[in-house]
From Swiss-Prot:
Enzyme kind, highest EC tier: ligase
Pfam family, one: tRNA-synt_2
Protein family: Belongs to the class-II aminoacyl-tRNA synthetase family. EpmA subfamily.
Protein known as: Elongation factor P--(R)-beta-lysine ligase
Alphabetic keyword roster: ATP-binding, Ligase, Nucleotide-binding
Encoding gene, per UniProt annotation: epmA
Length: 325
């Protein structure tokens, strides 16, 4: 596409028409399966505690908030959707905006479209099957490859991520010319994520989608720990053509355990000099009330559309990315 004036959409109108058709196809996919579409707030008084996520925030100064009320733009609709699940919604999905105050570039935009869905009584493997069904319908791609996080590291880095100590991880990082970052990093999971991003991701999902599952228990986030191997969590990610497309969990239903994880996140934030974030106690209360056993997944729709259209960057499939917003 030739250079356009900044008032014009960065994406060709033809691409936006195809994008609209894909959005309609996604809705048909879930309608055919009896999954309810829901809408949840874009702003909340609480936010994520994950040390790797940076939310936008604003202040509400309307009636009843004379001193101002801090609100956070949602990085994902997960917390509100789980409250619906606890209230008895059954299977649900949402197509909506999420916001992350992070990078903007070829595969990132601070405002993006997220597809998130939850399936009561599904385990991680059954949900992976459904994700694959959706990808094949939208992308007309081959059947996926599936490998564990441990297998991925052993295959591409010749190191066991579940048993390697920090010295061994730094040694592996040195082989990737990452010593300038790894040598001063004390957090084991950050080292693992660095190795995964640089040493594993570029080699998986090149010709067909790749599901990587059983991430380390220390990276469980909102997922349950495997009952078969307590070293790993029931969590998966999906990669295709060098792009991370989705992140899914067999969801943690224990409110007390989830609260402990959030509190640990905030302690980690404090150690790193990051602001501590307000914990969503409405989510904790919903979990304690009773979240059904379920699995859920979040998928980046802009990236999905980019792959479906064979586009090179998100700005080819988004009308007005941040530079033109």
């Amino acid at each position: 596409m030739s250079e356009t004036a900044s008032w014009q959409p960065s994406a060709p109108i033809a691409n936006l028409l195809k994008r609209a058709a894909i959005m309609a196809e996604i809705r048909r996919f879930f309608a055919d399966r009896g999954v309810l579409e829901v809408e949840t707030p874009t702003m909340s008084q609480a936010t994520v505690t994950d040390i790797h996520l940076v939310p936008f925030q604003t202040r509400f100064v309307g009636p009843g908030a004379a001193d101002g009320l801090t609100l956070y733009m949602m990085t994902s609709p997960e917390y509100h959707m789980k409250r619906l699940l606890a209230a008895g919604s059954g299977s649900i999905y949402q197509l909506g905006r999420s916001f992350r105050n992070e990078e903007a570039g070829r595969h990132h935009n601070p405002e993006f479209t997220m597809l998130e869905w939850y399936r009561p009584h599904y385990d991680m493997y059954r949900l992976m099957d459904e994700v694959e069904d959706l990808l094949q319908q939208i992308l007309d791609c081959d059947s996926s490859e599936r490998l564990s996080y441990q297998q991925a590291f052993l295959r591409h880095l010749d190191i066991d991520p579940l048993s390697a100590d920090k010295a061994q991880l730094r040694e592996a990082a040195a082989k990737l010319d990452l010593s300038n970052i790894a040598d001063t990093e004390e957090d084991r999971d950050t080292l693992l994520q660095l190795l995964f991003t640089v040493g594993v991701e570029p080699h998986i999902g090149r010709d067909k989608p790749a599901f990587v599952y059983h991430f380390p228990a220390s990276q469980a986030s909102l997922a349950v720990i495997s009952t078969e191997d307590h070293r790993v969590a029931e969590r998966f990610e999906v990669y295709f053509k060098g792009i991370e497309l989705a992140n899914g969990f067999h969801e943690l239903t224990d409110g007390d355990e989830q609260l402990k994880r959030f509190e640990q996140d905030n302690r980690s934030r404090e150690k790193r000099g990051l602001p501590q974030h307000p914990i969503d106690m409405n989510l904790i209360d919903a979990l304690k009330h009773g979240l059904p056993d379920c699995s859920g997944v979040a998928l980046g729709v802009d990236r999905l559309v980019m792959l479906a259209l064979g586009a090179e960057k998100l700005s080819d499939v988004i009308a007005f990315p941040v530079g033109r917003a």
